[in-house]
């Protein structure tokens, strides 16, 4: 039976939405085209009527995932009024056990990181990912920096917390990183002191 144009567009939307979730949850190589299409009640043949390759779907799914992230960040701004408060609330969410335990609906910066690190060559997917990281960093930026240190810290922490899920270390990673990112700005004790200053004024 011939599928209408409207139904074809809906099938494509569902495939991209499912891929966006499953790729973040299982990794690009952790889900086959057949299993992806089965999850939305469609056939593999239907996939190739919509996409030239799995790589094309990965690029579209990554773009859709970062679009969802943009909407999430905008909602934090709307809900919390001023950007500093919104940024703090985002850190609270990002370093939560809820975010750790639900990668399929979580941040694509972390969700696609492993696959992007294994990408052998530059291309549309990597360009999409890099653009998403830059936009996330811009949202996290402050007068003190461009947001990249915060994004790197958040993503690294959530990846490690997921990798150690079920252990005490996982919880500690989330808590310690949250404490570090929300501490008042300023030099940490001992970091910028000279050896003599640490030993006290009577040091010789």
Regions found by a protein language model. Give the residues of each.
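Short amphipathic alpha-helix in the helical subdomain of ABC transporter nucleotide-binding domains
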Residues: 8, 83, 87, 146-150
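N-terminal intrinsically disordered/low-complexity leader segments
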Residues: 1-10, 187-204
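Hydrophobic/aromatic-rich alpha-helical bundle segments in the mid-to-C-terminal region
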Residues: 120-134, 140-193, 204
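Short alpha-helical scaffolding segments that buttress acidic/His motifs in well-ordered protein cores
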Residues: 90, 94, 109-113, 150-157
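Helix-turn-helix
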Residues: 14, 22-56, 60
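Amphipathic alpha-helical segments used for helix-helix packing
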Residues: 86-89, 100-130
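Hydrophobic alpha-helical connector segments
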Residues: 60, 74-106
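Short, basic, alpha-helical segments at the C-terminal edge of helix-turn-helix-like DNA-binding modules
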Residues: 63-69
